[in-house]
Amino acid sequence: MSGPGIEGLAVGLNKGHAATQLPVKQRQNRHKGVASKKTKIVRELVREITGFAPYERRVLEMLRISKDKRALKFLKRRIGTHRRAKGKREELQNVIIAQRKAHK
């Protein structure tokens, strides 16, 4: 009775009417915090025009000379939370990587 191909059993863990499950759509509230295409473009444009804040330039210098931990501590003092500081550090590291790729 416990064969893998049997469906619609009367007893056991797999008992009940055999039915195919519909794919469940992701709920709309799960999109909180995800930037839209338009938002990404606008932020990219603003970054291109305004450049970096003074504290961000200082962090970029720290990251260039491999002072990652010092940069994180500095960012945490400026931004306020550890999690946001980690995100900002990651963002600025990606900027440095992009600059190196563009330079080659």
From Swiss-Prot:
One record GO biological process: cytoplasmic translation
InterPro entries in the cross-refs: Ribosomal_eL36, Ribosomal_eL36_sf
Biological function: Component of the large ribosomal subunit.
Record note on quaternary structure: Component of the large ribosomal subunit.
The protein's name: Large ribosomal subunit protein eL36
GO CC, alphabetical: cytosolic large ribosomal subunit
Family: Belongs to the eukaryotic ribosomal protein eL36 family.
Keyword annotations: Acetylation, Cytoplasm, Ribonucleoprotein, Ribosomal protein
Biological source species: Caenorhabditis elegans
